[in-house]
Amino acid sequence: IPWTGMLAALAAGKYDAAVTGTIMTEDRLKAYDFVTPIASATHYFVRRAGDNSLQSVADLSGKTLGVQAGSAQLARLPELKALLAQTGGTLGKVVEYPSTPEIYADLANGRLDYMINSIIGAQSVVKERPKVFALGQPVSGAGYHGWMVAKGNTDLLNYLSGFIAQMRTSGRLAELQNKWFGQAFDDLPTTPVT
């Protein structure tokens, strides 16, 4: 099911939960409740591996950025803008794309200077294509990935959060994080986010 269709179906009550690593945003929290977080969603910039001119947040000033339309990437831009302002810089041209693979294609081909993504997505593409992409610095504060339930479905929210708590206590959550994300996230909130 397409991403936007999944969100609409959950909001309409067609589904009880979206068990996928959804990034929590203020807008999403207005419509959905989130199970206890399963991973970090701090955003980092990703650059071309051969472009050594982009080493710090300050170096991003005035550069062309690609983001996915309607995404958490777009929602994190005010944080990036504030970080740039602290260095005396400004947010450059922002190009919105329908999907993340298109952003990476244009970044690889030099049509963009950088893109931003959560640590999981950023590390994944850098690991898969280290000669093409390189990981930059954080461009946002803390953020989280979690499963969504319809707003007010407290029974399901607590049930799924209890499952995550058991996984955390047993060490299985850290094992799965290491296996799939390349690192464990020990500093996540331990309660649902509503």
List the predicted regions and their residue ranges.
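Acidic, polar ligand-binding/catalytic clefts
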Residues: 1-59, 133-134, 138-140, 192
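Hydrophobic residues within well-ordered alpha-helices
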Residues: 10-11, 45, 60, 107-108, ...
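Bilobed "Venus flytrap"/periplasmic-binding protein-like clamshell domains
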Residues: 22-23, 41-99, 119-123
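Ligand-binding clefts/hinges and TM-proximal coupling segments of bilobed small-molecule sensing domains
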Residues: 72-94, 130, 134-135, 165-194
